[in-house]
A protein has these predicted regions:
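Acidic-aromatic substrate-binding/catalytic surfaces of carbohydrate-active enzymes
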Residues: 1-26
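A generic structural signal for short beta-strands and their flanking turns/coil linkers
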Residues: 6-12, 33-35, 45, 56-58, ...
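Hydrophobic side chains in beta-strands
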Residues: 14, 41, 64, 75, ...
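Extended, loop-rich substrate-binding clefts of extracytoplasmic carbohydrate-active enzymes
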Residues: 24-66
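Divalent metal-coordination and catalytic microenvironments
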Residues: 39, 73, 206
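Beta-strand-rich recognition/accessory modules
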Residues: 46-54, 134-214
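Acidic, contiguous internal or C-terminal segments within carbohydrate-active enzymes
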Residues: 50-91, 95
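Active-site/ligand-binding surface loops and adjacent short beta/alpha elements
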Residues: 82-84, 92-164
Length: 214
């Protein structure tokens, strides 16, 4: 359904994230995840899809290796004027208990928690997944790790060209009991990577922006 919220997997947010850097775009998280892609390569371990939306060309490549899922996103401005674009992978990661989870690799980055309105910068290198976590991180390094303490494991995220990250979990101090996503908060953490908000990118006409994550 075109208006359905996607809860799981790796939804692709482009050419804007949320409602855009100026909070004036609809639908939320862009058109890419509501657009049909043409598959141009379909090998057993590599898929490439292309689409065109709002004068922005989208190319998304997914490669599966023995140790990682590698994704590369290219956004091309087909307009005659510069365009501000954002691109994020809204990755859902399964954990044993989100209340015990932490994200490592944030020291020195700035943060803005959109659930609480708080802002600051990280002195420590870890962010705990507490209630009301909807935290946009800017100036983040190329290596993050989700520490899944209850299962004794780490999920590593490595990026290229991705200055932004978002850590989100629907656990809330005012959760409504009839919200199925909120009820499932313990089972997952979203560690999203790409370029968004303060790090949205101005792409010149007939130029492109490429980023990757694994």
């Amino acid at each position: 359904e075109s208006e359905a919220v996607i809860r799981g997997g790796i939804p692709l947010c482009a050419p804007w994230f949320g409602h855009g850097p100026n909070n004036d775009q609809d639908p939320q998280h862009g058109l890419a995840r509501r657009t049909d892609f043409e598959v141009t390569v379909a090998d057993p371990f590599r898929v490439v899809g292309v689409a065109e939306t709002a004068s922005i060309g989208i190319r998304h490549e997914v490669v599966m290796t023995n140790t990682a899922l590698e994704m590369t996103l290219t956004l091309t401005n087909h307009d005659q004027k510069p365009r501000v674009v954002e691109g994020m992978w809204h990755t859902y990661l399964r954990v044993a208990d989100a209340a015990q989870a932490r994200v490592r690799g944030v020291r020195g980055a700035s943060w803005h928690n959109f659930a609480t309105g708080d802002k600051g910068s990280f002195d420590a290198n870890e962010l705990a997944v507490a209630p009301d976590t909807d935290t946009v991180i800017q100036g983040v390094g190329p290596a993050l790790a989700l520490l899944d303490s209850a299962w004794g494991r780490q999920i590593h995220v490595e990026t290229t060209g991705c200055p932004s990250a978002v850590v989100w979990n629907p656990r809330s101090s005012s959760t409504h009991a009839d919200n199925p996503t909120a009820q499932a908060w313990r089972d997952f953490v979203c560690v999203e990577t790409g370029a968004c908000k303060d790090n949205a990118v101005i792409v010149a006409p007939h130029s492109d922006l490429t980023m990757s994550t694994r």
